[in-house]
Amino acid sequence: MAFDKDAIIASLKEASILDLADLVKAIEDEFGVSAAAPVAAAGAAGDDAAAKDSFDVELTEPGQAKIGVIKAVRDATGLGLKESKDLVDGAPSVIKKDLNESDANDLKSKLEAAGATVALK
């Protein structure tokens, strides 16, 4: 049996979508392969995290000392008392966006010192 690529392509062009789906399934079963698209390697995601240059500081939990956390949020953001309280009460909430690593870590330390649980994203 000779392999004629052009004839196969012409046959595929004339086939219906259902016929092509059946063909793909038959090829997967016959050869033990999958037609699924390959996913990115986990190592690449780790490299992106290491190269990240801007961080969002997210208040995940205000903790027991909510008043201290509200004061820390107010000092860090320059917001009014009500806006700061709303941010803390609405946790999880982003306190500041697009900070460099040192500023994000400083803010995280201040909020944690006030009793909050904080994540950098």
Curated annotation (Swiss-Prot):
Keywords: Ribonucleoprotein, Ribosomal protein. GO terms for cellular component: cytosolic large ribosomal subunit. InterPro entries: Ribosomal_bL12, Ribosomal_bL12_C, Ribosomal_bL12_C/ClpS-like, Ribosomal_bL12_oligo, Ribosomal_bL12_oligo_N_sf. It holds the Pfam family Ribosomal_L12_N. GO terms for molecular function: mRNA binding; structural constituent of ribosome. The keyword Ribonucleoprotein applies. GO terms for biological process: translation. The keyword S-adenosyl-L-methionine does not apply. PANTHER family: 39S RIBOSOMAL PROTEIN L12, LARGE RIBOSOMAL SUBUNIT PROTEIN BL12M. Homodimer. Part of the ribosomal stalk of the 50S ribosomal subunit. Forms a multimeric L10(L12)X complex, where L10 forms an elongated spine to which 2 to 4 L12 dimers bind in a sequential fashion. Binds GTP-bound translation factors. Belongs to the bacterial ribosomal protein bL12 family. Forms part of the ribosomal stalk which helps the ribosome interact with GTP-bound translation factors. Is thus essential for accurate translation. This is Large ribosomal subunit protein bL12. The gene is rplL.
